[in-house]
From Swiss-Prot:
This is Adenine phosphoribosyltransferase. It is found in: Cytoplasm. Belongs to the purine/pyrimidine phosphoribosyltransferase family. Catalyzes a salvage reaction resulting in the formation of AMP, that is energically less costly than de novo synthesis. One of its GO terms (biological process) is adenine salvage. InterPro entries: Ade_phspho_trans, PRibTrfase_dom, PRTase-like, UPRTase/APRTase. It catalyses: AMP + diphosphate = 5-phospho-alpha-D-ribose 1-diphosphate + adenine. It is an enzyme of class 2 (transferase).
Length: 171
């Protein structure tokens, strides 16, 4: 299935000069959504845990984990997860950000696939990898709906490791 048919361009969103890749048509089409989850599940069969960032990583990671009967671990911004959390700060172009996971859900030695909607610059994904590795997880794969190739996120992620990155669609 050609998933590009279900991803539309929205000019100047969320700000002027940005060409936003809108996945709403894919989510609104049951066959395209099912195909996407099925393909992601094929790619994630060989890991112990699925991890996804808020919010759109939840859209693809949770149903993939459920399909495979594997756990799904949320990565969120501060103040969004109850209980004890582990935090990782990372730099953005203009400032920094923090990501968190709940303590105790990742076990040392578990293999992980990170599932998200888009790979752009790779900064968020790189921070998630570091957060997981600091907990003893082995990040094997990053599975994405789409990759914005010109933003070089793949190069940022793979320059320090040999994590497999798989994108269902590349722009």
């Amino acid at each position: 299935m050609d998933l590009k048919k279900y991803i539309r361009d929205i000019e100047n969103f969320p700000k002027t000069g940005i060409m936003f890749k809108d996945i709403s048509p894919l989510l609104a089409n049951g066959k395209a959504l099912n195909y996407t989850i099925t393909e992601m599940a094929k790619l994630a069969q060989d890991v112990d845990v699925i991890v996804g960032p808020d919010a759109r990583g939840f859209l693809f990671g949770t149903p993939t984990a459920a399909f495979l009967k594997k756990p799904f671990i949320m990565v969120r911004k501060p103040g969004k997860l109850p209980g004890d959390v582990i935090s990782k700060s990372y730099d953005l172009e203009y400032g920094n950000n923090v990501l968190q996971i709940q303590k105790g859900f990742i076990k040392k030695g578990q293999t992980v696939a990170i599932i998200d909607d888009v790979l752009a610059t790779g900064g968020t994904t790189k921070a998630i990898i570091k957060l997981l590795e600091e907990q003893g997880a082995i990040v094997k794969k990053v599975i994405l709906l789409l990759e914005l190739v010109d933003l070089n996120g793949r190069q940022l992620i793979t320059k320090d490791n040999d994590i497999e990155i798989v994108s269902l669609v590349k722009f």
